[in-house]
């Protein structure tokens, strides 16, 4: 896989040590390739962009370690089996968490994730030094692999950081390209996030430097409140549109875990 690079950026809340999280992502991707496609690659060309230590002074020690999926657990999404109508989504700020709890019957686990999301998002948007550092880490990693065929996989809040960095690079480095952008469990459809994007970039569209954009979402994932981003983000000037794909996240809990997304058949 010479000349190709997979770059991953994690999402909300605190995380385990940097090396450990990278190993968990790598193992999840390997498992998905082997079980879903019969492809066995010992060492994927994978680089992890880690930013949890900007927001949290110490790594998380009470975390979900990667574990292989039970036999038969990795399934494609079957239309209708998980459907629940999510219409009229309100803004997830202020009492937005109460709105989500009332309409989607979210339990305590989902509450905690959403509260972490709101806190992390608030700091990203309100504290310039934090925002600049998170963007810098991803931007530098992307530019380190300029000229290679880059697959950029972003989870949760990492999709917001990635979107902003790609829009920045579209202006600053017009020849830079990402061959494949994959957003998983993304909050890019949240009204509050879309407003911030419009405030900074004036338009919501596929970044000009992206050749392909796939958005994977589980309808049970409360962070991916809007599973269909195509209606929110226009095509770029080369006609590249976001392609939405519903998936079945086998991890359980609130079905937001990155490992479940990374090993799903649609990935």
Task: Describe each PLM feature range.
Residues 1-52, 56-63, 96-153, 157-267:
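Lipid deacylating catalytic domains
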Residues 54-102:
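A basic- and aromatic-enriched beta-loop-alpha substructure that forms the phosphate/nucleotide-
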